[in-house]
């Protein structure tokens, strides 16, 4: 086992990364090894997908399968060995199919098939023990003693960034949005990473390419969500319980939420969002469901306590899931799509009857709690509509600064930095937030500036796209570069979606971003220095010191 992809990975003087019997996320060594093997198989598929594409052979099934299966290896997504093995076997079948199609296309074109790299020729074992014995071939740091640590760091930056992009591709696909050109570029990068490079410049360029690719993917996802559900609008949301039977929907998949709402209509069940599903409540399409009563709980890391206290059924539509046995609710939590946990019921297809039956059999909430409201829904359209008013308040001096404070949440005490930063932001500043990092402060009162709320919740982590559009619009209005705006980005990171959002921002030329609470363990000190010199990327320090720098206070 070697896994170093998330913020909570083990860090010791002897070396970084989880490499023992179990990772900090709860992932067992065997699961980690199988995931590495799956990635290796997917890279082999992408090699053939890329070569076949050069001859005009495109398989849409493969184009959707590879990102989806890759998504299953993100932090806190799938801990079920049998599901990972099934993905690996499916990858082997797709690779063989593409191999045959590629060779047939070569023959038809009168050319010889190329000799492809080992990753495209690897023969997957037929049993779990055999696959585990093959794991060293796919270990991400297998050649660490033969290469410079910066090379390994750059490879991992690319791999983890591409994982985040794969997740957004799958979210978009669920909403009916795919793009053959994007899929082709995705395969090219997967294939490149399957043949480990030692060229630092090429790896760095690839990291930026991944950021650019993800910008297009986020635009595609934004289109999928807004075309399906309308544009989010400022919406007041209750965060307390309502009397009645209950289902909690966590993750990111709004299509699943829609299906659950349709199937629970008239059944006396209240539906709540959780975590990154909170932004769904701002979409017009969901407002017709009176039994979508609000948001329950907070960010992913608190789920073992919150789900244990929730007297209904829970559906995990995507990341993040953690051990449900701790809170003894494994019999009433259900997984979907790429999510998996051993022993937990997995819902296949679009029928949520098993979830509904469980919710009806449980007690539900026995009384209404005193409501506590928050306001959400300041995504792209709402921000653009407010832009003239915002500009006017900037010009008259009422708004002097903007902070984007968001990203992933986590349980490290150092993450109180983000709460303190939001609290300490000057009263003449506006705070934009997104991702589950918002839960560090989104229930606090920040007031307004001439009717403009000082806290603007943009949405999910992928709604960084909305923030980028606002920044571009403001830079055009003020006729300046984005980096000349009175705007500072302070991003909390935890997993691979945050990595790819960061790469996207860097690839767009956004500078002086702060990240925290700790830098990625796979980034060497030298790489961190290069990123700081090139982009001004730096780690958070203290709220007082960082605010002085951001506000140019002597």
UniProtKB/Swiss-Prot annotation:
Sequence positions that bind hybrid [4Fe-2O-2S] cluster: 252, 276, 320, 408, 436, 461, 495, 497
Q: What is written in the cofactor note of this entry?
A: Binds 1 [2Fe-2S] cluster. Binds 1 hybrid [4Fe-2O-2S] cluster.
**Which branch of life, at top level?**
Bacteria
EC number(s) per entry: 1.7.99.1
Q: Name one GO biological process term.
A: response to hydrogen peroxide
Q: Which InterPro entries match?
A: HCP/CODH, Hydroxylam_reduct, Prismane-like_a/b-sand, Prismane-like_sf, Prismane_a-bundle
- Reaction(s) the record says it catalyses: A + NH4(+) + H2O = hydroxylamine + AH2 + H(+)
Q: Name one GO cellular component term.
A: cytoplasm
Q: Write out the residues that bind [2Fe-2S] cluster.
A: 3, 6, 18, 25
UniProt keyword annotation of Iron present: yes
Cofactor(s) the protein requires to work: [2Fe-2S] cluster; hybrid [4Fe-2O-2S] cluster
Q: Which residues carry this modification: Cysteine persulfide?
A: 408
- Keyword Iron-sulfur recorded: yes
What Pfam family is a match for this entry? Prismane
Which locations, inside or outside the cell, does it occupy? Cytoplasm
GO molecular function terms attached to this record: 2 iron, 2 sulfur cluster binding; hydroxylamine reductase activity; metal ion binding; peroxidase activity
Q: What does this protein do?
A: Catalyzes the reduction of hydroxylamine to form NH(3) and H(2)O.
Read off the HAMAP family from this record: Hydroxylam_reduct
Supply the NCBIfam families for this chain: hybrid_clust, PRK05290.1
Q: What is this protein called?
A: Hydroxylamine reductase
Naturally occurring in which organism (per UniProt)? Shewanella sp. (strain MR-4)
Q: Which gene encodes it?
A: hcp
């Amino acid at each position: 086992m070697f896994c170093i992809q998330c913020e909570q990975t083990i860090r010791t003087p002897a070396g970084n990364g989880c490499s023992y019997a179990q990772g900090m996320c709860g992932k067992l060594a065997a699961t980690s090894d199988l995931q590495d093997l799956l990635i290796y198989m997917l890279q082999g598929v992408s090699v053939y997908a890329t070569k076949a594409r050069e001859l005009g052979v495109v398989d849409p099934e493969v184009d959707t399968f590879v990102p989806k299966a890759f998504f299953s290896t993100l932090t806190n997504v799938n801990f079920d060995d049998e599901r990972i093995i099934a993905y690996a076997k499916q990858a082997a079948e797709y690779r063989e199919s593409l191999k045959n199609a590629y060779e047939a296309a070569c023959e038809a074109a009168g050319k010889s098939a190329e000799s492809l790299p080992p990753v495209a020729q690897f023969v997957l074992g037929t049993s779990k023990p055999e696959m585990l014995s093959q794991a060293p071939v796919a270990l991400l740091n297998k050649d660490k003693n033969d290469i410079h640590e910066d090379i390994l760091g750059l490879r991992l930056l690319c791999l983890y960034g591409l994982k985040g992009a794969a997740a957004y591709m799958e979210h978009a696909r669920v909403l009916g949005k795919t793009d053959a050109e994007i899929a082709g570029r995705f395969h090219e990068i997967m294939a490149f990473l399957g043949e480990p490079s030692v060229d630092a410049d090429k790896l760095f360029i690839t990291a930026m390419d991944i950021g650019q690719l993800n910008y297009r993917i986020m635009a595609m996802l934004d289109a999928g969500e807004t075309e399906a559900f309308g544009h989010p609008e400022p919406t007041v949301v209750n965060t307390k319980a309502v009397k009645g039977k209950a289902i909690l929907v966590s993750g990111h998949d709004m299509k699943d939420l829609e299906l659950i709402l349709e199937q629970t209509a008239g059944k006396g069940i209240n539906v709540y969002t959780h975590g990154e599903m909170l932004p769904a409540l701002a979409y017009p399409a969901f407002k017709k469901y009176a039994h979508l009563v609000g948001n329950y709980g907070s960010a992913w890391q608190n789920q073992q306590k919150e789900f244990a206290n929730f007297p209904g059924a829970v559906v995990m539509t995507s990341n993040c899931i953690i051990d449900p046995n701790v809170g003894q609710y494994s019999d009433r939590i259900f997984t979907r799509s790429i999510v998996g946990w051993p022993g937990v019921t997995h819902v296949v297809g679009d029928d949520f009857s098993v979830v509904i039956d469980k919710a009806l059999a449980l007690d539900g909430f026995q009384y209404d709690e005193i409501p506590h409201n928050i306001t959400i829904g300041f995504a792209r359209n709402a921000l653009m509509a407010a832009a003239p008013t915002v500009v006017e308040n900037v010009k008259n001096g009422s708004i002097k600064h903007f902070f984007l404070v968001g990203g992933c949440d986590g349980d490290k005490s150092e993450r109180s930095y983000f709460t303190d930063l939001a609290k300490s932001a000057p009263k003449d500043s506006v705070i934009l937030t997104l991702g589950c990092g918002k839960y560090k402060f989104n229930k606090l009162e920040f007031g307004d500036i001439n009717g403009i709320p000082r806290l603007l919740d943009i949405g999910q982590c992928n709604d960084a796209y909305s923030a980028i559009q606002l920044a571009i619009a403001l830079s055009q209005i003020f006729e300046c570069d984005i980096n000349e705006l009175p705007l500072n980005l302070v991003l909390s990171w935890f997993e691979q979606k945050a990595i790819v959002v960061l790469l996207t921002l860097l690839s767009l030329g956004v500078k002086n971003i702060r990240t925290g609470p700790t830098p990625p363990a796979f980034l060497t000190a030298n790489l961190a220095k290069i990123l700081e010199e090139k982009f001004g990327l730096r780690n958070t320090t203290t709220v007082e010191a960082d605010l002085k720098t951001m506000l140019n206070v002597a």
